[in-house]
């Protein structure tokens, strides 16, 4: 603003010279009224030349407005002035008695405070106070705390604070008073682009959407930095709403409502708060607003006809699989549905449940259904949002392990006891996703194997039983999302004193062996994409440079940075990194320090658990051993592999009187990393070996009568496994998931005339899982399609006793090829087609070979499918007739998807 000869002093209201930019207006009472109205809410002034603008006498109105007790609210950013000087602003704001700036420079800016008014709405702060005061009757005799968060400027950055801001709570609840005091000590980043440690108020302020949760205790530390204080004050439910000036999209602050009660539904509180704000000429995101007509699309006959089909199909599936809940989702624009998370920008991407086309057999799940109906999702949020966005089927074994940011309904699902879920997109003939069906597996279905079997069966049912003339489920990939969380160890400087915090409660999730398959498949030349939800990190100490921090250490997930993830992954893997958090800060201070380049990660407890410790628990189940040692079963398996133990030795030996074909060989020892394990060290620990059934079938072998040749080790250092066709075969695929944990070993008693235990031979050594792969596996989660196997079976067919005797009995050399990998092994005379497939799967580390086709090279040099026993007999006959030295077999991905049989010609790929 120009000033011609400097202002004379601005008497009265501190008016400007007529030669200013407002000089076009005459010096009349109307002009003064105009200026009064212009400056009523305050404004920023800026000089455009080097002349000074002085106000030598304090304006009564300015003095009143700038006084600390006036209802004055300073906002973190001025929408009409982007380049004002923060330093100058901070210097001038405390001046309540004099407003003077000598020799103003070009571009200098300062604040003219709002004029005092006796009206009901002299400032936003006062209006907010009136708004929450209007809730007094609503929260009376209830455990509610209502507080306001507003933006402030500190050192050039914006932060949200509730210090000295309006608040309301019932004085009878001392815990709420304490939480109010705690909240005043927190500042949350409010600058655009901030993602880390912004807290609940910060997310609402930046995203301009309301957010609520039934229980803040389910938040991760980075999502809710006040988590520890909330636990102490018994705070549970929370609702936060953005506040806007009516007709403006600029967020002025956040209203937060907390309660000591778990709440699944906040519709009533949301509507009351919105009406209270509207009464003082403010607004929030409201589900009462009608969407813009340009986005609104009324249901067509197509959608109306599809809803009964979908509803009946969901009800049928729920009855067949005992599902507690099945939901149908559609874009809000298709339904003409309104919601609190809508805006003109995102309305086209918002999806919500179709309440008339859902199936809720479980009464306890109705609260979750209501929460879904109230809380809409944006495309990309949760497995439903991902299905709309990527046009894929998405399966998650545990929805409650998602962060609230990635799945806003994760907390509601946890309270409702829901776990595994599958999202299925329904496409129209145009190829667009019109609906998404969301199925929640039975609440008791927690075992990995059970989930896999149910998933396969459900996929078959979806393909075969869904009938619609306009909607289809085919040509879709399946992506399995595996959220993994692991405890971090923090070391913070609290009150200038270094204090190391010991490990807190660890939330462990067993690594799915699906991941192992994806890693192995990629090593063999297959193209695999890994989808990251949470990156798993080894426990390590992280330091904080912030003093007097209000944030106490609690379990948290701090993923690796992108370059670290890429380095940690298997070479050649294409890593698709999803949502992650970088180094975070709260209140301007660094919360966590990143790992130094080249710093070696701390080893886990595996290194402290030696072979001697493991041997003490060989007589029991792996689950019991893991519990006694103090690790999870998955970790114990990894420890065993490091010692060369591929299978847990223990099992109860029953049905020993089976034929020699079914019970052939037993391995006498295990070649560990620190030496051999002799069977006599734990052989007598199995009481079943001395049972009457044992002795009745043949002479028993005592530990001190073991033949000398049994002391020799096997070639590959692991126990020989029983024939997979044996009814007593039991493969421990999921630790702790079966009631027969004791039946997971591989010890068998051979039954022959001399009752002698023979050791197994293998021409090629089994590929051991190296430590680097283990580390990579521990921090990955996999993306897979229907082409990839869902069922795991690592049992291996039996091998003969020696190479010479095998050849003498007609053993055949086999060379198998899978991509760039090649293996050689011996086909035993006693083997059938099943044993051949099993050996190939074991050598290539394939979990389920039924997903692949076997082909052999015939006498015409053509590749012929090998699908059954008859094909194998034909292959062997050709081998003998042509007198070739080796049978050549090729392993390729199956041309058709096979889930519990086959989809037939469904087109799934």
UniProtKB/Swiss-Prot annotation:
Residues 725-745 have a biased composition (Low complexity). Pfam families: GAF_NLP (PF22922), PB1 (PF00564), RWP-RK (PF02042). Residues 811-894 form the PB1 domain. Residues 55-70, 690-716 have a biased composition (Polar residues). GO terms for molecular function: DNA binding; DNA-binding transcription factor activity. Keywords: DNA-binding, Nucleus, Transcription, Transcription regulation. InterPro entries: NLP, NLP1-9_GAF, PB1-like, PB1_dom, PB1_NLP, RWP-RK_dom. It is found in: Nucleus. Residues 595-676 form the RWP-RK domain. GO terms for cellular component: nucleus. CDD domains: PB1_NLP. Probable transcription factor. This is Protein NLP1. It comes from Arabidopsis thaliana (Mouse-ear cress).
């Amino acid at each position: 603003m120009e000033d011609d000869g400097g202002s004379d002093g601005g008497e009265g209201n501190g008016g400007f010279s007529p030669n200013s930019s407002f000089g076009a207006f005459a010096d009349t009472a109307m002009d003064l009224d105009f200026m009064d109205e212009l400056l009523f809410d305050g404004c920023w002034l800026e000089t455009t030349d080097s002349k000074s603008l002085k106000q030598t006498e304090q304006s009564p109105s300015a003095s009143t407005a700038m006084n600390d007790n006036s209802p004055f609210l300073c906002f973190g950013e001025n929408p009409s002035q982007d380049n004002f000087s923060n330093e100058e602003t901070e210097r001038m704001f405390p001046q309540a008695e004099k407003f003077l700036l000598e020799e103003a420079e070009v571009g200098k800016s300062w604040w003219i405070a709002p004029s005092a008014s006796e009206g009901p709405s002299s400032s936003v702060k006062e209006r907010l106070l009136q708004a929450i005061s209007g809730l007094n009757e609503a929260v009376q005799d209830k455990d509610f705390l209502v507080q306001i968060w507003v933006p402030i400027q500190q050192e050039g950055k914006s932060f949200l604070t509730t210090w000295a801001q309006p608040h309301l709570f019932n004085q009878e609840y001392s815990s709420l008073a304490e939480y109010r005091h705690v909240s005043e000590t927190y500042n949350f980043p409010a600058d655009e682009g901030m993602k880390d440690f912004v807290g609940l108020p910060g997310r609402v302020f930046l995203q301009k959407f309301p957010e609520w949760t039934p229980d803040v205790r389910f938040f991760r530390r980075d999502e809710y930095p006040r988590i520890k204080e909330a636990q102490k004050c018994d705070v549970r439910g929370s609702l936060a709403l953005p506040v806007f000036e009516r007709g403006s999209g600029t967020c002025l602050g956040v209203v937060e409502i907390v309660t000591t009660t778990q709440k699944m539904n906040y519709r009533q509180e949301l509507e009351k708060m919105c009406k209270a704000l509207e009464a003082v000429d403010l607004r929030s995101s409201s589900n009462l607003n009608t969407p813009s007509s340009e986005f609104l699309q009324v249901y067509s006959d197509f959608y109306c006809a599809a809803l009964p089909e979908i509803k009946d199909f969901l009800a049928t599936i729920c009855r067949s699989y005992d599902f507690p809940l099945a939901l149908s989702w559609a874009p809000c624009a298709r339904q003409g549905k309104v919601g609190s998370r809508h805006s003109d920008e995102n309305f086209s991407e918002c999806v919500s449940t179709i309440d008339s086309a859902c199936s809720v057999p479980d009464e306890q799940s109705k609260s979750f259904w209501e929460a879904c109906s109230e809380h809409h999702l944006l495309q990309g949020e949760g497995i439903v949002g991902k299905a709309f966005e990527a046009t894929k089927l998405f399966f998650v074994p545990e929805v409650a392990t998602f962060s609230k940011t990635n799945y806003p309904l994760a907390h509601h699902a946890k309270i409702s006891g829901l776990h595994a879920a599958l999202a299925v997109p329904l496409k129209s003939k145009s190829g667009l996703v019109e609906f998404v069906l969301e199925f929640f597996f039975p609440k008791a279905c927690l075992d990995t194997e059970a989930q896999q079997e149910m998933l396969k069966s459900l996929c078959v049912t979806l393909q075969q039983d869904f009938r619609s003339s306009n909607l289809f489920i085919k040509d879709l990939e399946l992506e399995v999302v595996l959220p993994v969380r692991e405890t971090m160890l923090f070391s913070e400087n609290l009150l200038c004193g270094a204090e190391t915090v010991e490990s807190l409660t660890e939330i462990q999730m067993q690594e799915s062996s699906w991941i192992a398959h994806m890693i192995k498949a990629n090593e063999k030349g297959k193209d695999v994409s890994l989808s990251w939800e949470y990156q798993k990190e080894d426990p390590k100490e992280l330091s904080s440079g912030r003093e007097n921090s209000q944030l106490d250490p609690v379990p948290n997930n701090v993923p690796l940075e992108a370059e670290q993830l890429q380095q940690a992954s298997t070479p050649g893997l294409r890593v698709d990194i999803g949502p992650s958090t970088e180094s975070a800060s709260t209140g301007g201070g660094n919360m966590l320090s990143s790992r130094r380049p080249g710093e070696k990660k701390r080893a886990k407890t595996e290194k402290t658990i030696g072979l001697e410790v493991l041997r003490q628990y060989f007589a029991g189940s792996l689950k019991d051993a893991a519990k006694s040692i103090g690790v999870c079963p998955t970790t114990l398996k990894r420890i065993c592999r490091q010692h060369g133990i591929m299978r847990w030795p223990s099992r109860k030996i029953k049905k020993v009187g089976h034929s020699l074909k079914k019970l052939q060989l037993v391995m006498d020892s295990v070649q560990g990393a620190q030496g051999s394990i002799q069977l006599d060290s734990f052989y007598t620990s199995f009481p079943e070996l001395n049972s009457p059934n044992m002795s009745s079938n043949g002479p028993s072998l005592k530990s001190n009568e073991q033949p000398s040749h049994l002391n020799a080790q096997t070639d590959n250092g692991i126990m020989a496994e029983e024939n997979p066709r044996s009814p007593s075969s039991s493969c421990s695929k999921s630790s702790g998931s079966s009631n027969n944990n004791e039946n997971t070993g591989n010890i068998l008693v051979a039954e022959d005339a001399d009752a002698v235990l023979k050791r197994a031979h293998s021409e090629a050594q089994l590929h051991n899982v190296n430590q680097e792969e283990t580390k990579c596996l521990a921090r990955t989660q996999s993306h897979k399609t229907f082409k990839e196997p869902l069922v795991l079976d690592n049992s291996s067919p039996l091998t003969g006793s020696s190479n010479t005797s095998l050849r003498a009995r007609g053993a055949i050399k086999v060379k198998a090829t899978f991509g760039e990998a090649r293996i050689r092994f011996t086909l035993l005379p006693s083997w059938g087609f099943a044993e051949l497939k099993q050996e190939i799967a074991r050598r290539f580390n394939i979990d389920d070979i039924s997903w692949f086709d076997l082909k052999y090279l015939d006498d015409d040099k053509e590749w012929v499918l090998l699908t059954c026993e008859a094909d194998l007999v034909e292959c062997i006959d050709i081998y003998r007739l042509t007198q070739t030295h080796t049978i050549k077999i090729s392993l390729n991905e199956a041309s058709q998807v096979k889930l519990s049989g086959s989809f037939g010609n469904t087109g799934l790929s």
